[in-house]
Regions:
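Generic multipass alpha-helical transmembrane bundles of integral membrane proteins
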Residues: 162-182, 186-281
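Membrane-interface helix-loop-helix junctions at boundaries between adjacent transmembrane segments
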Residues: 98-164, 168-202
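Alpha-helical transmembrane segments in multi-pass membrane proteins
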Residues: 17, 60, 64, 68, ...
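Central hydrophobic cores of alpha-helical transmembrane segments
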Residues: 81-90, 226-231, 322-328, 348-349
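Alpha-helical membrane segments and immediately flanking helix-loop junctions
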Residues: 60-70, 85-89, 246-317, 346-362
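Transmembrane alpha-helical segments and their short flanking loops
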Residues: 34-45, 241-250, 275, 293, ...
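Short juxtamembrane and helix-loop transition motifs at transmembrane-helix boundaries
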Residues: 39-50, 184-190, 250-256, 277-288, ...
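Early transmembrane hairpin of solute transport permeases
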Residues: 2-140, 313
Length: 401
């Protein structure tokens, strides 16, 4: 799971830049489309769609590289060969498309969001097999006098051959089924059901509840939850982006941007509101100092100073608003999006440290930025009575001293 998470982190620049190109095709400003048509012609959007398709549109390819590299470092095996065997595996399982004119090729759609789960599973299996073969010593050993740049390719011959053989049999096996390919099997039996569950409000509430409880007990809830859920949420974002690219409407309300830019305003459980409550209302010396320390990091969605400095960890009083805020952000935003107050995210991604309001405008215009402000106010109200309680207790202790 950590390799998958690190693999996604490694391709973040590609995803962010690609989503920004998509943003340029649909900037939410009146008259923008007409202006661009007059400036660049009727097909002006294609100027931005090609970079989008070569980044976000084939994100599975970049994820393969990221995960293979991360696994290679963890297992201490050759990084380059790990990436190579991963691509061998994924290409072996990708069906060849034959056009009416007899042209053959690999459809790019198989490397988009729809191929994400196959890419993740295949990469993990390929590197695992490669590691097993190498660590068992099933390689061709050349004398030490042979230069490493010559010996290395020979050492990889047997592992690479085994990867080819195994995944060729896997390919043949799937072709004998009604699914016809591993791609169709994974998408139908695994990715679609997980996306269907992950895009529902009840499942999201459950995930956020688990995340909150993990944090309360001192575990990094965001890392644990994101390693499982981020591939699902990102694939939903990618499908929204693909729909926009085809001129259709984005349909997945819950996606990566929903979580990152509405639920986590200031960090898990929208703790920017908590930081603001402390700054504006705290009277005790302890919490005044904490407010000054935590506000700037919170503006960039970093809330560890609050979680461990307040602390929220193992704090029964602060655990209550922490859980309530995390879930409330999701419920209220989902309802507002469902009735049309807030637009559905089109899949544009910005760095997770982008401050709220700015991130909202970048991913969806002034309506999203305004909604982020509203959600910060809501979180402020949720945390306010609890901060007043613990601040009063702390102030009494300080006065007794």
């Amino acid at each position: 799971l950590n390799a998958i998470k690190e693999g996604f982190f490694g391709v973040m620049p590609v995803i962010i830049v690609g989503s920004l190109f998509l943003l340029f095709t649909s900037i939410p400003i009146n008259g923008y489309s007409e202006f661009m048509t007059g400036l660049l012609g009727e097909n002006w959007s294609q100027i931005f769609m090609v970079p989008y398709r070569m980044s976000y549109g084939i994100m599975s390819i970049y994820v393969v590289v990221g995960i293979a590299r991360s696994l290679a470092h963890f297992y201490k095996v050759d990084t380059r060969e790990s990436i190579v065997v991963s691509f061998i595996a994924i290409f072996m399982l990708t069906p060849v498309l034959v056009t009416e004119d007899g042209l053959k090729g690999l459809p790019l759609d198989n490397f988009s969001a729809s191929g994400l789960f196959l890419a993740i599973i295949t990469t993990c299996l390929a590197v695992e097999i490669f590691r097993f073969v190498v660590q068992k010593g099933w390689t061709i050993k050349l004398p030490d006098s042979v230069p490493q740049n010559v010996a290395k390719p020979f050492e990889a011959l047997i592992p690479v051959a085994i990867i080819f053989i195994i995944f060729n049999f896997v390919r043949i096996g799937f072709e004998m089924t009604s699914f016809k390919s591993a791609q169709n099997f994974i998408f139908t039996m695994l990715q679609q059901p997980l996306q269907s569950i992950g895009s529902t409000l009840p499942a999201t509430i459950l995930v956020l509840l688990i995340e909150s409880i993990l944090w309360i007990f001192g575990l990094h809830g965001s890392s644990i939850v994101s390693s499982v859920m981020n591939p699902i949420w990102r694939s939903l974002s990618a499908e929204n982006a693909a729909a926009i690219g085809l001129g259709k409407a984005a349909t997945h309300i819950i996606n990566y941007q929903f979580i990152a830019n509405f639920v986590k305003l200031g960090g898990t459980a929208a703790t920017l509101g908590l930081a603001l409550v402390i700054v504006f209302t705290a009277k005790s010396s302890r919490y005044k100092a904490l407010g000054k320390l935590s506000l700037i990091p919170s503006l960039f969605n970093i809330n560890e100073p609050l979680i461990f400095g307040m602390p929220i960890v193992l704090n029964p009083i602060m655990a209550i608003p922490f859980v309530i805020a995390n879930i409330t952000m999701a419920i209220v935003t989902y309802a507002s999006t469902y009735i049309g107050l807030v637009p559905v995210s089109i899949g544009v991604e910005v760095p997770w440290t982008t401050p709220p309001i700015i991130s909202g405008f970048l991913i969806g215009g002034w309506r999203v930025a305004l909604w982020q402000f509203v959600m910060i106010v809501v979180s402020f109200v949720i945390y306010l009575p609890f901060i007043k309680k613990i601040d009063t207790l702390e102030l009494n202790k300080e006065n007794q001293k």
